[in-house]
Design a protein with these regions (language model features):
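Active-site core segments that coordinate phosphate-bearing ligands/cofactors
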Residues: 1-104, 113-137, 143-173
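Glycine-rich Rossmann-fold phosphate-binding loop(s) that bind the pyrophosphate
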Residues: 110
Length: 174
């Protein structure tokens, strides 16, 4: 589900108040509620297209016997708790299926800018998170084309060029 839940809450809060909160404002609200322990399964179909993401998060908490968020900050913290928990479960499942032990997580695209989620993911997985570049999809496409055209000798060469050309932020587990 990823950042869809966050985007939906942002849109909904904007409709309620007439002013759409910024992502930094949503993060600040979540941080103020950082001790809130609500959690839901972000992969649940109920979050695909609810009329109200806020009400759906609250209902899922209630249905799961978890603390029900009362503020927008608690709703946001529930989503952050849930995403980082689900990322940790996905890493465990991936390691189990592949027999490989992963030593880090790379996050690209717009979500790589959410350093609060990146830090929570590092903490939940106990793996360092490397965030960026934000234009990961376009760069990946370009990288493949440049490898094919002989501009890079292989994937490792292309990755090294990306790493030298863009800022990649690191979040270590705490």
């Amino acid at each position: 589900m990823g950042l869809w839940m966050i985007q939906s809450v942002r849109r909904e809060l904007g409709e309620q108040t007439g002013t759409r909160p910024s992502f930094p404002e949503l993060i600040a609200a979540a941080q103020e509620a950082s001790s809130f322990a609500g959690i839901v399964s972000t992969g649940d179909d109920r979050f695909l297209a609810p009329k109200s993401m806020i009400k759906e998060v609250k209902a899922a908490c209630k249905d799961g016997g978890k603390p029900v968020p009362a503020t927008s900050g608690e709703v946001m913290q529930t989503i952050y708790n849930s995403l980082s928990h689900d990322y940790q479960a996905a890493i465990q499942e991936l390691q189990s299926l592949t027999g490989k032990e992963y030593t880090s997580i790379n996050i690209v695209g717009g979500g790589s800018q959410d350093m609060y989620l990146n830090q929570m993911t590092a903490n939940a997985t106990q793996l360092p998170v490397f965030a960026g570049p934000t234009e990961g999809t376009a760069l990946g496409n370009l990288m493949v084309q440049m490898i094919r055209a002989g501009e890079f000798k292989d994937l490792a060469d292309a990755r090294a060029s990306i790493k030298k050309s863009f800022t990649i932020l690191e979040c270590d587990p705490q």
